[in-house]
Structure formats: structure tokens, C-alpha cells
Curated annotation (Swiss-Prot):
The modification 3-methylthioaspartic acid is found at residue 89. One of its GO terms (biological process) is translation. This is Small ribosomal subunit protein uS12. The gene is rpsL. Residues 1-29 are annotated as: Disordered. SUPFAM superfamilies: Nucleic acid-binding proteins. HAMAP family: Ribosomal_uS12_B. Coiled coil: none annotated. Part of the 30S ribosomal subunit. Contacts proteins S8 and S17. May interact with IF1 in the 30S initiation complex. One of its GO terms (molecular function) is structural constituent of ribosome. It comes from the Bacteria. With S4 and S5 plays an important role in translational accuracy. Interacts with and stabilizes bases of the 16S rRNA that are involved in tRNA selection in the A site and with the mRNA backbone. Located at the interface of the 30S and 50S subunits, it traverses the body of the 30S subunit contacting proteins on the other side and probably holding the rRNA structure together. The combined cluster of proteins S8, S12 and S17 appears to hold together the shoulder and platform of the 30S subunit. PROSITE patterns: RIBOSOMAL_S12. It comes from Rhizorhabdus wittichii (strain DSM 6014 / CCUG 31198 / JCM 15750 / NBRC 105917 / EY 4224 / RW1) (Sphingomonas wittichii). Belongs to the universal ribosomal protein uS12 family.
């Protein structure tokens, strides 16, 4: 614990908040190119094959991002837009791919929560 004299000389330094999405560099979304599209398994106690993509961003950072929704058309060299937001049961996955933007198609036959999956209004 510092003495009063030390506090007068130096003062307390406010703690800096560390970003949860450093690769975004304070941007809401960022564009990138898929370098690898694959499936991975979640942590215990969940079980599934989660679709993820390794993306090289325009700031030349490589990140792993989750592809939400049922079915996707992404492959290597697809251009995608990513947003922040981690997937709790996939360690190291801190970003989401935006559906219905650039090379990513929206989810087919989606009736509810369409805006989150880039699906147009059904006729």
C-alpha cells in the first residue's frame, strides 16, 4: 500500500479496459477473405459440429469467426463481413460472419428473426 507522499507524487492510474474484439480496431464490422472453412466441436457439455471460418481481415489479421444459421455457401476465398460477438462454447471464436452481405447468402426459408440471418421477407 502506498504512502500519502507516494500518492501525491504519482497518483492512482485508472485501469484501461481491454477490448474483447481487438481485431475490429473499434469498427462495427470488418471485411475479410475466408482462408479456411471447417467445422469444430464445442466444449463440454455440448455436442455439435459448429461451422466456422478462418478469415484474413483487411488489416491483415487472421481471426476465427462463427457462421450462424442452418446451411451456408462459404468456401475458401469468399469475401465476408464480420462483426464482434463470441460463441460461448467455442474457445477462440470471438467474431460472427454477417449473413446476407457480400459473398454470404442469407439463411433459406427463415421465418423468424430474419434480420439476424439476412433472409428476405417470404411472399
Amino acid at each position: 500500500m502506498p504512502t500519502i507522499n507516494q500518492l501525491i507524487r504519482k497518483g492512482r492510474e485508472p485501469q484501461k479496459a481491454k477490448s474483447k474484439v481487438p481485431a475490429m480496431e473499434k469498427n462495427p464490422q470488418k471485411r475479410g477473405v475466408c482462408t479456411r472453412v471447417y467445422t469444430t466441436t464445442p466444449k463440454k457439455p455440448n455436442s455439435a459440429l459448429r461451422k466456422v471460418a478462418k478469415v484474413r481481415l483487411t488489416n491483415s489479421r487472421e481471426v476465427i469467426s462463427y457462421i450462424p444459421g442452418e446451411g451456408h455457401n462459404l468456401q475458401e476465398h469468399s469475401v465476408v463481413l464480420i462483426r464482434g460477438g463470441r460463441v460461448r462454447d467455442l474457445p477462440g471464436v470471438r467474431y460472427h460472419v454477417l449473413r446476407g452481405v457480400l459473398d454470404t447468402q442469407g439463411v433459406k426459408d427463415r421465418k423468424q428473426s430474419r434480420s439476424k440471418y439476412g433472409a428476405k421477407r417470404p411472399k
